[in-house]
Amino acid sequence: MGSLEDVKNAVKFRIDGIGLFRSEFLYMESDHFPTEEEQFHVYRQAAELLGERELTIRTLDIGGDKGLDYFEFPKEENPFLGYRAIRIGLDQKEILKTQLRALLRAGTYGHIRIMFPMIISIEEVVDAYAVLEECKDELHKEGIPFQEEIEAGVMIETPAAVICLLYTSRCV
């Protein structure tokens, strides 16, 4: 799934939930990094369509074969495992924070879960969760409603993630 139209079609088939909503399509269809409000609008609509059914949204997974016209990637020997996905978000934290704030806010309209992609180390898991908690703190201080008890996890899709799976499972 990667769009509201996909969610609408899935709901017609009485699905139990969505296990992977690919948020990168929201970015790929834009000429700029979507704002918090732009993302919130899409995630809220998806959550409302599903009601109490789970909606697992993967945070931005660009790099490798998924580029953006408005973002330059460094030249790498293996761009599929290098500077992409969660590493971009942790390096350029405002990109990740904007998305997490939108997801947390939209979670008040349904049952949203967050999935961090392309994890290669336990440090990335710890850092991603720290950014999530930072966003919760900000929203709380600003008095903005959000899904406080949001579930978050990681996508096990790299050899390094498999190797550190035992340690990762203790954190998520």
Task: List PLM regions with ranges.
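Conserved alpha/beta-domain cores
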Residues: 1-170
